[in-house]
A protein has these predicted regions:
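Active-site loop/helix belt of alpha/beta enzymes
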Residues: 2-5, 11, 175-255
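A cross-domain feature marking catalytic cores of carbohydrate-active enzymes
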Residues: 79-81, 102, 125, 144-146, ...
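A charged N-terminal "starter" segment
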Residues: 1-158, 162-166, 207, 243
Length: 255
């Protein structure tokens, strides 16, 4: 435990802690070196006061990569910007071997200014024309919620006279299995898996404009059984996409 934290606990007789707080070593070192400064900052800016240590993202990314290494896995890690809006953290993340996903036009502008090159950015979420236009102009990967978004992206690409294919994922929803129960609220984003024939037909019809990266899905449920079914369904469609000659590059299991 940090010496400064220990002193505060000992001075406050009303504080009864059964367990010491778990403090990151970087944070602990800062507290030990600057115990008075912390109180000065609270006096100046008020409470609650959030102090950010951007360099901690390096440790987190390294921990993720270690999981890949231990399990002989390959893949690309994505930092998600929606719940992590600190520009300083995004800038630090850009110095690591990670990509990033965004869910709005404003967020896309932000991550571009933080040092992420377009090939490291993926656009998710509902996309109006302004958001979609910026994504197409910058050449970032588009994670489409529906075929309408893809059609609009193609039209924007052609109107701008762009020759390079658009990198796209197609987000799936509506997963099903006889052994697991799903509700209509589960997996509300994406194209229903029952519409797979329409997806394949669209992708093949627009193969000159779209570079199909693969399928994606977002799953917020804590149910391990549902997550397994979602992965199974997505892998089945990935295999079918290969048979259809679409050459998917991977599977996005995060968004």
């Amino acid at each position: 435990m940090s010496n400064a934290v220990q002193q505060i606990i000992e001075q406050d007789n009303t504080t009864k802690l059964s367990l010491p707080p778990v403090i990151n070593p970087i944070t602990e070192a800062f507290i030990d070196r600057n115990p008075d400064m912390i109180f000065d900052l609270v006096d100046a800016f008020g409470s609650p006061l959030n102090l950010i240590f951007p360099q901690m993202i390096d440790r987190n990314i390294a921990a993720f990569k270690e999981v890949y290494k231990k399990n002989n896995l390959s893949g690309q890690i994505y930092f998600t910007s929606k719940p992590n809006k600190s520009v300083s953290i995004m800038r630090q993340a850009s110095t690591n071997d990670v990509n990033i996903d965004v869910s709005s036009e404003k967020a896309l502008h932000t991550v571009l200014s933080c040092g992420f090159r377009p090939e490291r950015i993926e656009c998710t979420g509902p996309k109006n024309l302004d958001y979609l236009s910026l994504a197409v102009q910058q050449g970032v990967t588009i994670n489409a919620d529906n075929l309408t978004e893809l059609q609009q992206a193609i039209e924007i690409k052609k109107s701008l006279g762009l020759q390079e294919k658009l990198r796209v994922f197609v987000r799936l929803s509506g997963f099903n299995s006889p052994r697991v129960k799903f509700t209509s609220q589960d997996g509300t984003f994406g194209v229903h898996v029952n519409k797979a024939p329409e997806i394949f037909a669209f992708l093949k019809a627009n193969i000159e404009d779209l570079d199909f990266q693969g399928f994606a899905y977002y799953w917020s449920s804590a149910s391990e059984e549902q997550r397994i079914v979602a992965l199974e369904n997505a892998l089945e469609l990935t295999s079918e996409a290969i048979e259809q000659g679409l050459n998917p590059k991977g599977l996005n299991i995060g968004g």
